[in-house]
Regions:
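Short beta-strand scaffold segments in enzyme catalytic cores
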Residues: 41-53, 307-312, 371-373, 459-467, ...
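Active-site rim segments in enzyme catalytic domains, especially the processed small/beta chain
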Residues: 36-39, 46-68, 85, 228-230, ...
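Short, small/polar residue-rich loop motifs at catalytic or cofactor-binding pockets
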Residues: 241, 303-306, 367-369
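Internal maturation/activation junctions in enzymes
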Residues: 164, 270-325, 334-338, 344-345, ...
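Glycine-rich phosphate/pyrophosphate-binding beta-alpha loops
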Residues: 255-263, 310, 322-333, 366, ...
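Noncatalytic scaffold domains of N-terminal-nucleophile
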Residues: 1-10, 14, 22-204, 209-211, ...
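Extended C-terminal subregions enriched in glycine
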Residues: 281, 301, 315-317, 363, ...
């Protein structure tokens, strides 16, 4: 089990050790990661899951992306005079950042419905047992170590604007938690309300959120703060399971999500790479540049701040899961009744009217998440994905190519230098690349070099697993202070 937080990975690995399926482990990890990494995902998230069923030799996609509330009025998001938004991407500025921050930015979440749909189809372990570990983690409260302090401090000003977010994440409602440089920290977030919410969802099932008491309290909190999400929006939400988008690639295969995700754009990029025998970094940049151009012309341009985890079980079933609140800390709003940090999915829409992706009521969001499962020419199967908004696509492309085209192991692929080409007319390259590669990239597009670091991330943050000759392995971003892969035997 490979995830962006070891505690969440341990939850999934424990499910595997107890005899659960990869899908069971994915569901348990989905709930757990929202507790221990609350700025990335949680019960208010949306996302997508790729599933490989070894017995069927077939890939499935579960799409649980967000939707705009049906009662949303685009007139409530007037454009400000001049300027561009300062968050994840340069939309025209909306008055008071109503599409970015606050309850007006909250979209209908889908992650709980997505987990329910996948669990009903493939799960073996009881729903309550899969949600219970997350409730226990929330009862304990997320440990406030140096990295948590860094993430909260970097968003403290925005969090302070919502009294409930400030009460949860900030000391005295205004200061980021101060972590001692030398002492072992014993500080924890007070997530008892979230724990109670998770206990209710464990006992009553997803209906508690989608039409029940949890949903009723959540919708009231959002409306009391000025948002438009209603209980009817929650009750009417549906996740969808469809066949995955299959991309044959040089003797191997990559399965991605169709529709309003990064999957179709990844397929374009992979098909562009087919023309090169052993593609290099300039080939990656060219393939990504062409794919982004097509995406911008046909689908729009979106970003996000997400989390990703991947799992493989002893039978060879794989799951690759990406879920997100969109921005870091989402809308920077917390529901006081439920303890749920809320998304800002409305920012996924273009605030200018008359565009293909313009803001409208009851509309699906277009995301960049791109979880995949794949197969190398030698028959090894992998599941991987990443967090990082636009950076996700290039990372998934390169990691897949490293393994399929260059025969790299999972560990080797994750340690190799990468580039980022996110459709902005420039390339960001790892400074560890040879000078001649940098020069060649510069001849194609202006290229800046950066050192791979902990914060901020210049590249996406991947997590992946691989099964080869009945041996399972996992790996996470090498610079991540929290990410880790955990084997089920470690939980014995």
């Amino acid at each position: 089990m490979a995830a962006q937080h070891k505690r969440a990975a341990e939850v999934g690995a424990a499910v595997l050790e107890a005899g659960g399926d990869a899908l069971d482990a994915a569901v348990a990890t989905s709930f757990a990661i929202g507790v221990v990494e609350p700025w990335m995902s949680g019960l208010a998230a949306g996302g997508c899951m790729q599933i490989w069923r070894a017995g069927e030799a077939r890939a499935h996609t579960v799409d649980y992306g967000m939707r705009s509330p049906r009662g949303l009025d685009p007139a409530d998001y007037p454009l400000a005079q001049g300027g561009k938004a300062q968050d994840l991407f340069a939309w025209p500025l909306v008055k008071d950042d109503r599409n970015v921050q606050g309850a007006t930015a909250v979209a209908v979440p889908g992650v709980v419905a997505g987990m329910e749909l996948a669990h009903k189809r493939f799960g073996r372990v009881a729903w309550r047992e899969l949600v219970a570990p997350a409730a226990a983690l929330a009862r304990e409260g997320m440990l406030l170590d140096w990295y948590a302090g860094l993430m909260i401090a970097s968003n403290a000003r925005a969090l302070s604007r919502d009294p409930d977010a400030a009460a949860l994440f900030l000391e005295d409602g205004q200061w980021p938690p101060l972590i001692s440089w030398t002492a072992v920290t014993e500080k924890h977030l007070d997530q008892r309300k979230l724990s109670h919410t998770l206990e209710t969802i464990a006992k009553e099932g997803p209906k508690a959120l989608y039409g029940g008491d949890v949903g009723r309290a959540l919708a009231k909190d959002i409306r009391d703060k000025g948002g438009s999400l209603s209980l009817e929006d929650l009750a009417g939400y549906q996740a969808h399971m469809v066949d995955a988008l299959e991309v044959p690639y040089r003797g191997g295969r990559v399965f991605a999500a169709p529709g309003m995700t990064g999957g179709p754009t990844l397929a374009v990029a992979l098909n562009n790479l087919q023309k090169k025998e052993r593609p290099g970094y300039v080939d990656y940049a060219r393939a990504l540049d062409a794919a982004w151009r097509e995406r911008f012309q046909t689908m729009g341009d979106k970003e996000g701040c997400t989390t990703h985890f991947s799992v493989v079980d002893r039978a060879g079933n794989l799951c690759s899961v990406t879920q997100t609140l969109l921005s870091v800390f989402g809308s920077r709003v917390v529901s006081p009744s439920t303890g749920i940090p809320l998304n800002n999915g409305i920012m996924w829409f273009d605030p200018e009217p008359g565009k293909p992706n313009s803001l409208a009521p009851g509309k699906r969001c277009l995301g960049n998440y791109c979880p995949v499962v794949g197969e190398t020419p030698k028959g090894a199967r992998f599941a991987l994905g990443a967090s990082g908004g636009r950076k996700i696509l290039g990372t998934v492309l390169q990691l897949s190519s490293f393994m399929i085209d260059h025969g790299a192991s999972l560990e080797e692929a994750f340690h190799r230098p990468r580039i980022d080409m996110s459709g902005e007319g420039r390339v960001i390259a790892d400074r560890a690349l040879p000078r001649e590669v940098i020069d060649e990239l510069n001849r194609f597009l202006p290229t800046a070099t950066v050192r791979r670091g902990i914060f901020p991330y210049a590249f996406a943050v991947p997590a992946g697993v691989l099964r080869e000759r009945e041996m399972n392995m996992g790996c996470t971003e090498i610079m991540s202070p929290w990410g880790d892969a955990v084997a089920e035997k470690e939980m014995r």
